[in-house]
């Protein structure tokens, strides 16, 4: 089994690269999906979030947009949330990996904060997806409906491409066409398959 961390700034194209790798046979596990799972109603994570952030509970459930807004500009609150969620996400990722029976599996863990959390060191290969800031802002305003100011604030809140690249084994630039990106992903996939084959 080969453990691959996939990261990149918001709007860089992580999800697109993950989908391309999945289409080629990778087992893709998304940290955001696991984060939603570990604070789903009835989980210990949900109870901890409700206790720490009672102001984001609506009708007994966590209002995820309100939670995101609550922690975005408050570093202390964000650290508290990460202390609840990140250990549970790591635990669930471990369970997913343990359940895989194929020794030649390429497991890609997609995590926007892989570098910021120090988790990159736990992966045999780290892939960083980059794109020019103007490209990312365009994607965020068009596809996600953010204002330019919101997009810039989200980008500024994350590690820089240079910080991510310092932890990377592979840097995929995603400023061109889908065809160009697909060709780059194909080369990376071929390399990953060679690594897992031994």
PLM features: residue spans?
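Glycine-rich phosphate-binding loop of ATP-dependent small-molecule kinases
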Residues: 1-62, 190-198
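Residue-level signal for inorganic ion chemistry
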Residues: 13, 32, 81, 108, ...
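An amphipathic alpha-helix signature
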Residues: 24, 46-50, 133-141, 148, ...
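Short, well-ordered beta-strand core segments
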Residues: 28, 124-128, 171-172
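Small-molecule kinase domains that catalyze NTP-dependent phosphoryl transfer to phosphate-bearing small molecules
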Residues: 92-94, 121-122, 142, 146-193, ...
């Amino acid at each position: 089994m080969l453990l691959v961390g996939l990261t990149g700034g918001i709007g860089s194209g992580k999800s697109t690269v993950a989908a391309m790798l999945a289409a080629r046979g990778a087992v893709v596990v998304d940290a955001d999906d696991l984060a939603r799972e570990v604070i789903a109603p009835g989980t210990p994570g949900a109870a901890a979030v409700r206790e720490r952030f009672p102001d984001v509970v609506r009708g007994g459930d966590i209002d995820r947009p309100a939670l995101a807004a609550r922690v975005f500009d408050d570093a202390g609150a964000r650290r508290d949330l990460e202390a609840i969620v990140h250990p549970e996400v790591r635990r669930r990722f471990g369970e997913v990996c343990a359940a895989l029976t194929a020794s030649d599996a390429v497991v890609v863990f997609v995590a926007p904060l892989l570098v910021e959390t120090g988790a990159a060191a736990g992966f045999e290969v780290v892939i960083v997806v980059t794109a020019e800031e103007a490209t990312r802002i365009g994607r965020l305003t068009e596809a996600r409906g953010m204002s330019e100011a919101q997009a810039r604030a989200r980008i500024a809140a994350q590690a820089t491409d240079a910080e991510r690249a310092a932890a990377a084994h592979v840097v995929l630039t995603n400023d061109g066409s889908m065809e160009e990106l697909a060709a780059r992903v194909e080369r990376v996939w071929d390399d990953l398959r060679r690594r897992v084959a031994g």
